[in-house]
């Protein structure tokens, strides 16, 4: 696990984009993408670059259950607004949050991942150490699955909704085992509220109580953090 400290999120996005360019030069074809505030500066770098992504496939980590793609709180909407409208890909995959059978949708998504192995996976990290929507206690062997969101995650995401009651209580998420199959992982974290999770991920025991700790076992992880998020690493 390599740690890169940056001044701010803008610099973090630039460094992540440089890593992506290196990966593309080596033949990367499938990107694993995340939502939330952490990767936005990275997506901004992608959109303003002259690179053509029309031969690439993207696979997103997760989607809320119960939100249509037209909902401005859906991750499908987020990705279109922040990346896909500005930079078309060959194909973009996200879980279908309105699937009538969400368990079958999870299995369908695993098949997509099997057909498109992820070369470059972007991650954020939750305050409780979750990656994707893999909450503390999630089995490291889990593949794509339906998640009951913890109160801390619902509270953290409520800033994007009119009220906390509007935050969906479930999501479909790529599993930890799915994430670990990625050839390369770039995790972005900014702000003091992420410091505990970053410390646990880097130095703590590998435990399902802190899902991101499993990344210690991955062969190619780069963590990009500002000084606030890195404040407990010294």
UniProtKB/Swiss-Prot annotation:
GO BP: carbohydrate metabolic process; glucosamine catabolic process; N-acetylglucosamine catabolic process; N-acetylneuraminate catabolic process
Covalent S-S links between cysteines: none
Assigned keywords, A-Z: Carbohydrate metabolism, Hydrolase
Catalysed reaction equations from the record: alpha-D-glucosamine 6-phosphate + H2O = beta-D-fructose 6-phosphate + NH4(+)
EC number: 3.5.99.6
Pathway: Amino-sugar metabolism; N-acetylneuraminate degradation; D-fructose 6-phosphate from N-acetylneuraminate: step 5/5
Protein name in UniProt: Glucosamine-6-phosphate deaminase
Role played: Catalyzes the reversible isomerization-deamination of glucosamine 6-phosphate (GlcN6P) to form fructose 6-phosphate (Fru6P) and ammonium ion.
Any Gene Ontology CC annotation: cytoplasm
Family under the similarity heading: Belongs to the glucosamine/galactosamine-6-phosphate isomerase family. NagB subfamily.
PANTHER family the record matches: GLUCOSAMINE-6-PHOSPHATE ISOMERASE
Organism listed in the record: Streptococcus pyogenes serotype M49 (strain NZ131)
Catalytic residues of the enzyme: 62 (proton acceptor), 128 (for ring-opening step), 130 (proton acceptor), 135 (for ring-opening step)
Molecular functions (GO terms): glucosamine-6-phosphate deaminase activity; identical protein binding
Plastid as UniProt keyword: no
């Amino acid at each position: 696990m390599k740690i890169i400290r940056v001044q701010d999120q803008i610099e973090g996005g630039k460094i992540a984009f440089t890593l992506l360019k290196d990966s593309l030069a080596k033949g990367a074809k499938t990107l694993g993408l995340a939502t939330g505030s952490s990767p936005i500066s990275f997506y901004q770098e992608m959109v303003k670059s002259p690179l053509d992504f029309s031969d690439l496939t993207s696979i997103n980590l997760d989607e809320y259950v119960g939100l249509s793609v037209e909902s401005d709180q859906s991750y499908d909407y987020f990705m279109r607004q922040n990346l896909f409208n500005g930079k078309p890909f060959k194909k973009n995959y996200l879980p279908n949050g309105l699937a009538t059978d969400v368990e079958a949708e999870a299995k369908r998504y695993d098949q997509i991942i099997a057909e498109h192995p992820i070369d470059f996976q972007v991650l954020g990290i939750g305050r409780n150490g979750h990656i994707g929507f893999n909450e503390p206690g999630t089995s490291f062997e889990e593949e794509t699955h339906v998640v009951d969101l913890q109160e801390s995650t619902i509270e953290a995401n409520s800033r994007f909704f009119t009220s906390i009651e509007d935050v969906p209580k479930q999501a479909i998420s790529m599993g930890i085992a799915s994430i670990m199959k990625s050839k390369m992982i770039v995790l972005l974290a900014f702000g003091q509220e992420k410091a505990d999770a970053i410390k646990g991920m880097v130095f703590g025991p590998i435990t399902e109580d802190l899902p991101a700790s499993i990344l210690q076992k991955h062969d190619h992880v780069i963590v990009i953090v500002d000084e606030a998020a890195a404040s407990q690493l010294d």
